[in-house]
Structures are given as C-alpha cells and as structure tokens.
Amino acid sequence: MKKIISTLLVAGCCLTSLMAQDVVVKGPDEKLQLVVFTSSAEKPSYSITYNGKTMLEKSPLGMNTNIGDFAKGMKLTGHTVTPIDTVYHQDRIKTSQVHYQANELNCHFENPKGQKIDVVFRVSNNDVAFRYALPRQDGKGSVTVTAEETGFRFPQQTTTFLCPQSDAMIGWKRTKPSYEEEYKADAPMSDRSQYGHGYTFP
C-alpha cells in the first residue's frame, strides 16, 4: 500500500511539473487568454480563448533556419510578463490619439544544440500578436528561414469576412488590385478565393 501511495505521489509530482511548463497570459481585462504549451514531448504550441470560447486551437510554433532547427525539441528556459501602457498619435487615421494597453509575454527557448530563440507575444483586450527574436549566434550576421512551422488552427465552425485578392493589371485602366473586391460575410473557412490568389484582410 505504501509503495502504491509513493508511486501515485511521484506520478502526481511529474504531472504537476509538466503542467507547470505551460505559460498563460491574459489581456488587461482578462477576457482574452493565450496559453503557450511547452512540453518537451512535442513542438511548442499555443492556443487562444476569449471569455472561455476557443478562438484558436492548439497551433504549432517555430521555424527552421540555415543555422538551426527552432521547432523540435525546444526547451523553455524562462519567461517574463511585462505590462504595456502607452499613448501614441497618428494624424492620418480616424482616431488621432490611441491609448494602447497589453501584456507582453517573452518566452525564452533553447533547442537541443543550445541555440536560443525568443517568442514575444502581446495580448491586448481584443488582439494577439507575436514575433520571433533570434539573438546573434556564432557570429552570424544574417539568418535564412528555410521552413516556417508556425500554424493557425481555427475551430471547425470558424467563418470569414475577407476580400479575395484580384488578378493583377485588370479592371479600370488595369489598376487592380488597387480596389477592394466584393466581400462575402460569414463564408466557410474552406471556401477558395474566386481568383485563386488567396485573400486580403479588410
């Protein structure tokens, strides 16, 4: 009986340790939530929910470059969360003064070769953005991305409001795609662009 209890305690500790590797950051109003999954058994990934509703299912992170693989076997070595609160001005948009608030999560990863990469997320009340930051390594002045591993896995019921990308040099005085095409509201994610060139965000 003691052996069984000891085994359960060890298993519980291991499970807690694995779960503790997942990193959570929320927007300032705590409705928008990002989770970064960093279990060593798989590639790093992330998901997004809003008010408990899934906006983005577990999606892969990472990339391959000419100096190393930053997608598989990545280990989280640390992370920081920094609140962002700033005001900036634009004289050519509808709102000239913008008050921007967000929480920034910086995840520090290391691949099996000890090469480092940061994934920097920003979560505001309505938006999520992220970027990769590669510190200079082995004296390299530039890096070539050879394969993109980043994914965006939307729930099956997701619909779109997108503008199909037009053929080039057609229409009035051959100026397209200078004008927006007709939008289709709540179109299924599986619908292909009518021109075969993908879509443009409005």
Model-derived features: positions:
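Bacterial Sec-dependent N-terminal signal peptides
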Residues: M1-D22
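N-terminal accessory beta-strand-rich subdomains and adjacent acidic, glycine-rich linkers
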Residues: D22-P202
